[in-house]
């Protein structure tokens, strides 16, 4: 996906390709995009709600990097993994129109990288997630949780499972962000597992999910339940 960035009066705008960007990310009116600047040519992306405090990772559905073209600024690559200790920007989405005024950015200084807004320290791995039985916690998983976890509300946790033949079974309609044609049903079992069914085969094939893959789902509710996913 190609977009063009333009800088006017100290603010950055997506001046071309905004409509495609919104469709690809599943961005909704009132939500925010946080860009963490890694280098002059690379940035990471996080999605926030209207209050800026429900922090939701934005993962490109293709699992590939999104490249952008420059316009009065250097070209950038949008990565699918946020990383701390870098400068950041925030884009507020107010409509679906493909105009630069819809994508104005501002500095982000109210979201710390190693503590929450109340000044509490970074949460431990055990405090950040539940791991299903028989799920091996690899260094990659721990690293992922340590990076993403800082953007969770303190009441939120990850639930990590290893995909198996009985995991995908449920009853609430969900959509993959950026892929409205892929819908599934979500169901919560008596032992608190969340399972998916109907449409799962198509979704798994699209995202290269196989038996024994470890997947991290990010569920959020725009008004409809949507998900983004990482496959480790």
Curated annotation (Swiss-Prot):
What are this entry's molecular-function GO terms? DNA binding
Entry GO CC: nucleus
What parts of the sequence cross the membrane?
Answer: none
| Organism classification | Eukaryota, Viridiplantae, Streptophyta, Embryophyta, Tracheophyta
**What are the entry keywords?**
DNA-binding, Nucleus, Repeat, Transcription, Transcription regulation
Intrachain disulfide bonds:
none
DNA-binding region location: 1-51, 140-232
Look up keyword Phosphoprotein and say if it applies. Answer: no
Q: Where is the composition biased (Polar residues)?
A: 108-121
Please indicate if the UniProt record lists DNA-binding as a keyword: yes
**Record field: compositional bias (Basic and acidic residues):** 95-107
Segments carrying the region annotation (Disordered) are 92-121
Which subcellular locations apply to this protein? Nucleus
The name this protein carries in UniProt is: Putative B3 domain-containing protein Os11g0242900
Domain of life where this protein originates: Eukaryota
InterPro entries named in the record: B3_DNA-bd (IPR003340), DNA-bd_pseudobarrel_sf (IPR015300), Plant_B3_domain (IPR050655)
């Amino acid at each position: 996906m190609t977009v063009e960035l333009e800088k006017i009066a100290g603010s950055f705008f997506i001046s071309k390709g905004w409509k495609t960007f919104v469709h690809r990310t599943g961005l909704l009116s009132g939500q925010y995009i946080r860009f963490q600047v890694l280098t002059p040519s690379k940035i990471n992306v996080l999605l926030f709600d209207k209050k800026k405090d429900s922090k939701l990772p934005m993962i490109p559905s293709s699992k590939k990097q999104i490249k952008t073209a420059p316009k009065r600024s250097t070209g950038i690559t949008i990565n699918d993994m946020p990383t701390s200790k870098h400068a950041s920007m925030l884009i507020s989405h107010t409509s679906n129109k493909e105009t630069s005024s819809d994508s104005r950015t501002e500095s982000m200084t109210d979201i710390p990288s190693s503590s929450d807004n109340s000044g509490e320290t970074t949460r431990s791995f055990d405090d950040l997630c539940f791991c299903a039985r028989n799920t091996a916690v690899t260094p990659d998983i721990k690293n992922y949780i340590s990076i993403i976890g800082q953007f969770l509300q303190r009441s939120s946790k990850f639930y990590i499972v290893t995909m198996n033949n009985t995991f995908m079974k449920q009853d609430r309609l969900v959509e993959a962000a950026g892929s409205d044609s892929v819908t599934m049903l979500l169901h919560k079992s008596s032992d608190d597992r969340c399972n998916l069914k109907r449409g799962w085969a198509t979704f798994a094939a699209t995202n290269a999910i196989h038996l024994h893959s470890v997947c991290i789902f990010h569920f959020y509710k725009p008004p409809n339940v949507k998900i983004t996913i990482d496959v480790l």
